[in-house]
Amino acid sequence: MTKNYIFITGGVVSSLGKGIAAASLGAILKARNLNITIIKLDPYINVDPGTISPIQHGEVFVTEDGAETDLDLGHYERFIHTKMTFLNNFTTGGVYSQVLKKERRGDYLGATIQVIPHITNAIKERIILCSENSNIILVEIGGTVGDIESLPFLEAIRQMAVDIGRKNVIYIHLTLVPYIATAGEIKTKPTQHSVKQLLSIGIQPDILICRSEKTVPLHERKKIALFCNVPVDAVISLKDVNSIYKIPKLLKNQKLDDYICNYFKLNVPEADLQEWEEVIYAEKNFNNTIVIGIIGKYIKLPDAYKSVMEALKHAGFKNKIKVDIQLIDSQEVENKNFQILKNLNGILIPGGFGDRGIVGKLLSIQYARENHIPYFGICLGMQIAIIEFAQNVVGIKEANSTEFDPQCKYPIIDLIKNRPNNSSKNYNKIENRINLGGTMRLGSQPCKLSANSLSRKLYNQEIIIERHRHRYEVNNLLFKKIEAAGLQVTGRSQKNNVVEIIELSNHPWFLACQFHPEFTSTPRDGHPLFIDFIKSAGKHKKNFI
């Protein structure tokens, strides 16, 4: 099977949307019956994003096999119907770590280890390893051309054209074409300079995707084509749109997929984008609008909750409801500032770490429980829902998590036992930690649902498989008293009897789960828990009115 590689780089500025562009292009090529995978190369020194602050990097997307990866992999999965693995994302730190381990073992037979060839060879090997079962491999290189961190990756993809043949490689450069409102003009000079910098590395782009506030007119695209040495048909205008799900059609309308298929000499059927037409239609046509509050601590960067926000939108599509998402800093609720919660039709508390803002989250859950507002807790959102119920309903004021209070008298939430590097009782003391990265309960795990429960009804099956990312779990030894008071466990892991889902029966909709259902939601299908949560929030609005 001939393998063709499409390398996507970015220029001028960061955050232009290379991930969305790669995912959208992948979706079009997938619709042409091509076998697609997408790889994200991140130039930072961290081994993976698992220990990076969400405020700096955005969410950590967890794959089925338990890899902690860049949030762009979430876009890849949602757009191309393909599950990502640990092979689909690697970093400079990960590559150097691998090479240094080999050096320590003596695998290089005494050679002097250098960026070229050892680091670049390791990068190429990882790319090729991930491409085994695909005939089109899209590779997104993080960062911006000109960054010192990106140089080994750019050199590696330059070499790949030599190794596998230039006819099997396309270089796409995504660049900013700014619109100067005061002059009423689009400026192409930044793109020209960015391409010049790419040429200095030895890479001639084959296609330019030009991000701009407005459509780049033909005469400007001709100018870009002339100065950047690409055909005018290969200069694609990507204007700002109000929905990422419009991007596949926008690229298709400019025949980007035709250009690529002709370049690779692929005889494949035309792309059928009917499913994307349906998504766009659902996004525009709704019967109701509701307000969902996400109570979190990382709200300064909305990307910290990217998959959760997308899953809420997907659920809205399925219910013909427009979901207005409000990001609320949990610390703003700590002084019992319930006014900011009063207009909400549903409250969601997502995953997180640390004790900052916990009081505000506890108060938000209490407000949702007492005022019959639909509540959905995810990961940490389940753990603190249990703490709130134990403190305020059961009357166990000492109930807490050892994450927030290592010496608490009633540790209803405690460290997962017998996990690598975290079985020590003094694990919460920084000096006793060995590794934080990669030491949680990660990836897909089976869960058994209780008969006659809401979750069983929604999933319509007894055994489900969902993705996890947590270091703390419910302490089963202390939970019986809480369960007797009415907080039901309706899902447990098959292997270790871990509490996975809780429900409150005397409430319109109160459900929380230890796993992360947002990672498997798609714009076409949604996710059963999110869909019913939004449905219940819609009912709450009608009742409230």
From Swiss-Prot:
Molecular function (GO) terms for this protein are:
ATP binding; CTP synthase activity; glutaminase activity; identical protein binding; metal ion binding
Keywords for the protein's UniProt record, in alphabetical order: ATP-binding, Glutamine amidotransferase, Ligase, Magnesium, Metal-binding, Nucleotide-binding, Pyrimidine biosynthesis
Q: Which domain of life is it from?
A: Bacteria
Q: Which Gene3D superfamilies match?
A: 3.40.50.880, P-loop containing nucleotide triphosphate hydrolases (3.40.50.300)
Question: Which residues are involved in binding Mg(2+)?
Answer: 72, 140
Q: Which residues does the UniProt record annotate as the domain Glutamine amidotransferase type-1?
A: 291-543
Q: What is its EC number?
A: 6.3.4.2
Q: In which pathway does it act?
A: Pyrimidine metabolism; CTP biosynthesis via de novo pathway; CTP from UDP: step 2/2
UniProt note on regulation of activity: Allosterically activated by GTP, when glutamine is the substrate; GTP has no effect on the reaction when ammonia is the substrate. The allosteric effector GTP functions by stabilizing the protein conformation that binds the tetrahedral intermediate(s) formed during glutamine hydrolysis. Inhibited by the product CTP, via allosteric rather than competitive inhibition.
Residues given in the record as CTP binding sites: 14, 147-149, 187-192, 223
Where do the record's region annotations for Amidoligase domain lie?
Answer: 1-266
Note the PROSITE patterns from the entry. GATASE_TYPE_1 (PS51273)
NCBIfam families hit by this protein: PRK05380.1 (NF003792), PyrG (TIGR00337)
The UniProt family comment states: Belongs to the CTP synthase family.
Add the further remark from the entry. CTPSs have evolved a hybrid strategy for distinguishing between UTP and CTP. The overlapping regions of the product feedback inhibitory and substrate sites recognize a common feature in both compounds, the triphosphate moiety. To differentiate isosteric substrate and product pyrimidine rings, an additional pocket far from the expected kinase/ligase catalytic site, specifically recognizes the cytosine and ribose portions of the product inhibitor.
Q: What is this protein called?
A: CTP synthase
- Which organism encodes this protein? Buchnera aphidicola subsp. Acyrthosiphon pisum (strain APS) (Acyrthosiphon pisum symbiotic bacterium)
